[in-house]
Amino acid sequence: MSFFNMVKPLIYKTDPELAHDLVDLAMRTARRCPLFFNPLVKANFVDDVMLHQKIWDLEFKNPVGVAAGFDKHATMVYGWPALGFGWGEIGAVTPKPQPGNEKPRAWRHIEYEAVQNAYGFNNEGVEVIKKRLKKIYPFILPIGANIGKNKTTPEERAVEDYKILVNELKDVVDFFVVNVSSPNTPGLRDLLNAEFISSLFGELKNLTDKPILIKFSPDMEDELIINLANYSVLAGADGIIVTNTTVNYDLVNSEIKRGGISGKPLAQRSYEVLRIVAGEVFGKVPIISVGGIDSAEEAYKRIKAGASLLQVYTAIIYKGPGIVGEINRGLIELLKKDGYSHISEAIGVEIPKKLENKA
């Protein structure tokens, strides 16, 4: 039995938010102790040429990244390699500090291997996070910033919040992710429309040459997903992340009707949305898949469906801190088994080809 499996019962008796704060503390402490930190990097970080990719002129050592929400305040970046991550996303960051929603705001659904969170973009604000990133940037791994509007900012002024964030962070991160799909900020998902996306990307593209991605909700109708995928690319999005958390509480029989569900129950819908988006924009912009990825097999399934990169978070809670390394090592074996010499050969191989109009 692994050490993680031995301590899991104790971890699950701890408040989810407190447990996360303890992980944050451990990550920040570990990097100051090479005798502990270096063996973790050696055990978990997979650096194999089969998984190397160059995307947006950035070097990715492996495809598995830190999902937004894990490192909200950019306090754990130094520790990413110790968990095996090849890149990551900090935040969500807002212009002004905000405490987020009232506690409790995180719940485990252990029998479903899921987490429900209603944090509400709690973060220290862009000024503090910018100072923190200045000390480490450029980092050995690509760093993205997940950016969102403050809760108190009205929808009609949302673009201004995103402009502030890009201006402040453009010299300390490698790319941006526009978050308009979190269920935890009232009215935020209403911004997932063509008019706002056009206005937003039109403004942000004038501020930076760095890639700007958009993250989709899994709760949109398929037709809207198709339309927004195409429109996002036309508006200038450099990539699409699918998906954010879901508000389908029936997936975990939750009596708590707030926040978003992540983890294994989201896997099927996240995969479906990936297939829809890939069917529309694969080859035009890179697609990142997140939601319920907890094994090499699931990761490989997403890659074959069109994902160039992947993200995990909840899997660490249920599978342990070695899961990213396991996924990457497993991916190499699966690629070899199918006769591939590089991950790029497998990306999108299962995307159905559209029937050509023979008229």
Swiss-Prot record:
Cofactor-binding details, from the entry: Binds 1 FMN per subunit.
CDD domains assigned to the protein according to its UniProt record, in alphabetical order: DHOD_2_like
Compartments it resides in: Cell membrane
A GO MF term: dihydroorotate dehydrogenase (quinone) activity
Residues binding substrate, per UniProt: 72, 117-121, 179, 184, 244-245
Keyword Kinase: no
Enzyme Commission number(s): 1.3.5.2
Keyword annotations from UniProtKB, A to Z: Cell membrane, Flavoprotein, FMN, Membrane, Oxidoreductase, Pyrimidine biosynthesis
Protein name: Dihydroorotate dehydrogenase (quinone)
Organism: Nautilia profundicola (strain ATCC BAA-1463 / DSM 18972 / AmH)
